[in-house]
């Protein structure tokens, strides 16, 4: 996990900070490639507080339960929040991929889930869909990188570049407002460890402006 909650019970000053950034100096904060996102919303802050209290009480990993709401509306925009490993986050990522109409971009430290790899390949084979991806851990055990390349998916390795590509985000249909421009980000790598063992969080924001900001990155 990498999140902060500020004043969850405040109606005007409730904040959540999420994304991929560890508070480590100097690597993650100043050198590695990461993203941080701030959301001001009381309901989302309270959902994160429920998750924090569960872990504060000693429940981690598979001992946690799916006890938080997942769907919110912030300034008229749909926002979703999922925690791992309790909330079946991978199934939501699969839906995110399958719902793409035109474009999908992803930037990931690790990508080792076969089901997600297959979903990306199947989506890339659909007429009119353009997919681009960046993966840091090209040669880690079980990496989907070689499978994606062999299938003709436009994916690039970040391995060997100075400083780590520590992101865990994906962007759907960023420049197609007739579709559903959406950002998916957080601390959840596309891996079985993130799905089944690690304590992670994922934020999905249905908003063209936010999606385009991440597309520019």
Residue ranges and their predicted role:
Residues 1, 5-217:
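Charged, low-complexity intrinsically disordered terminal segments
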């Amino acid at each position: 996990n990498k999140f902060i909650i500020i004043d969850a019970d405040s109606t005007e000053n409730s904040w959540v900070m999420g994304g991929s950034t560890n508070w480590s100096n100097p690597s993650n904060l100043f050198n590695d490639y990461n993203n941080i996102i701030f959301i001001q919303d009381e309901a989302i802050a309270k959902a994160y507080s429920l998750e924090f209290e569960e872990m504060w009480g000693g429940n981690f990993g598979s001992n946690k339960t799916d006890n938080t709401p997942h769907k919110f509306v912030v300034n008229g925009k749909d926002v979703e929040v999922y925690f791992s490993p309790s909330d079946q986050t991978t199934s939501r990522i699969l839906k995110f991929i399958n719902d793409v109409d035109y474009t999908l971009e992803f930037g990931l430290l690790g990508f080792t889930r076969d089901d997600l790899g297959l979903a990306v390949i199947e989506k890339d084979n659909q007429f009119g869909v353009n997919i681009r991806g960046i993966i840091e851990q090209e040669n880690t055990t079980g990496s989907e990188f070689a499978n994606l390349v062999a299938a003709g998916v436009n994916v690039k390795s970040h391995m060997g570049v100075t400083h780590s590509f520590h992101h865990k985000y994906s962007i759907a249909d960023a420049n197609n407002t007739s579709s559903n421009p959406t950002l998916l980000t957080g601390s959840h790598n596309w891996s079985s460890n993130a799905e089944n063992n690690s304590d992670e969080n994922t934020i999905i924001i249905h908003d063209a402006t936010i999606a385009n900001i991440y597309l520019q990155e």
